[in-house]
């Protein structure tokens, strides 16, 4: 049975969490004092919130961490009845460990309704002796102020490129293979600061038997930078038909959707040497195209319109 690398190589201690030195130092201080406040981890997907919570539990409880760490996902259980019944029942139970409390980790807490959060705040107050709540969310602004004021808020940033490279190289070494520079850069690019995504891509390309930028873009659903650069160049220079042919190839031969193409173009444009004013206009055009496609508009028509807008913007540059 194939083991999932995101689980196999999940950090086992706080020291193994990369790029969050300030947060890790605070957590280590809590561990040393054997005292833990309620916590709120805020940050985008793949920035290490869950891994940090698990590493914290391991350091606090040692080998018995699984018995003292309850993980729930609020997106699956976001109603007030769940708070009043299930979570309340879990929170009231006193654990048998020497610390006298357990951790209830609630992922995607920003998916809870305001009413459910209000009920949860009361549960936190009632059972703070037996349960420490650790919340994880993408947007702290969606967490009601009464909960924020009762937690230590820690913000997690996208993982820096150097730490993603370090982790991927560690995994590759342990699995007995190497990653060439071009493939590494491609994985860093498509991960966008998401460590979990980077590790999943690495396992996927390794399993495919081909570690190359081409395979990476194929697996992740991105167009190759070469194709995207050609598309942008043709569009900016007003070569509408040639740009459409490139889009046709991406969609028909490479199997990319309209959203895939828009995201690929956006990634290249952000790093391009297009003048700032025109770059802003192109990004606005990309945002409009993405919105319309998501709302159900025809991919082909929206991509044609996008090429036309980029051509118009390009005429101002030329």
Swiss-Prot record:
Supply the SMART domains for this chain.
Answer: AAA
Membership in a protein family: Belongs to the activator 1 small subunits family. RfcS subfamily.
Main role? Part of the RFC clamp loader complex which loads the PCNA sliding clamp onto DNA.
- InterPro entries noted in UniProt: AAA+_ATPase, ATPase_AAA_core, DNA_pol3_clamp-load_cplx_C, DNA_Rep/Repair_Clamp_Loader, P-loop_NTPase, Rep_factor-C_ssu_arc, Rep_factorC_C, RFC_lid
Keyword annotations: ATP-binding, DNA replication, Nucleotide-binding
Q: What is the protein named? A: Replication factor C small subunit
Which top-level group of life is the source organism from?
Answer: Archaea
Lineage from the top down?
Archaea, Methanobacteriati, Thermoplasmatota, Thermoplasmata, Thermoplasmatales
State a single Gene Ontology molecular function.
Answer: DNA binding
Bilayer-crossing residues are none
What is the source species? Thermoplasma volcanium (strain ATCC 51530 / DSM 4299 / JCM 9571 / NBRC 15438 / GSS1)
Subunit structure and binding partners: Heteromultimer composed of small subunits (RfcS) and large subunits (RfcL).
């Amino acid at each position: 049975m194939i083991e999932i690398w995101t689980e196999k190589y999940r950090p086992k201690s706080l020291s193994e969490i990369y790029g969050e030195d300030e947060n890790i130092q605070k957590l280590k201080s809590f561990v040393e004092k054997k005292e833990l406040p309620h916590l709120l981890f805020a940050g985008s997907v793949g920035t290490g919130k869950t891994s940090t919570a698990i590493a914290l539990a391991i350091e606090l409880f040692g080998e018995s961490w699984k018995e003292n760490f309850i993980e729930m996902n609020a997106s699956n259980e976001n109603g007030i009845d769940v708070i009043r019944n299930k979570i309340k029942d879990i929170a009231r139970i006193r654990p048998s460990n020497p610390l006298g409390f357990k951790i209830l980790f609630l992922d995607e807490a920003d998916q809870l309704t305001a009413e459910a959060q209000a009920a949860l705040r009361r549960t936190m107050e009632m059972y703070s002796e037996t349960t420490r709540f650790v919340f994880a969310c993408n947007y702290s602004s969606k967490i009601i102020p009464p909960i924020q004021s009762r937690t230590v808020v820690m913000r997690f940033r996208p993982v820096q490129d150097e730490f993603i490279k370090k982790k991927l190289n560690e995994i590759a070494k342990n699995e007995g293979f190497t990653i060439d520079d071009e493939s590494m850069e491609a994985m860093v690019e498509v991960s966008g600061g998401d460590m979990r995504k980077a590790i999943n891509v690495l396992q996927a390309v390794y399993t495919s038997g081909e570690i190359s930028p081409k395979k990476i873009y194929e697996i992740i659903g991105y167009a190759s930078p070469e194709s995207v650069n050609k598309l942008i160049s043709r569009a900016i220079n007003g070569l509408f038909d040639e740009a459409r042919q490139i889009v046709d190839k991406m969609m028909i031969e490479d199997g990319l959707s309209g959203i895939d193409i828009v995201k690929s173009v956006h990634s290249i444009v952000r790093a391009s040497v297009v003048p700032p004013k025109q770059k802003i206009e192109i990004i606005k055009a990309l945002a409009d195209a993405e919105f319309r496609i998501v709302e159900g508009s025809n991919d082909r028509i929206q991509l044609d319109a996008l090429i036309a807008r980029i051509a118009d913007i390009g005429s101002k540059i030329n």
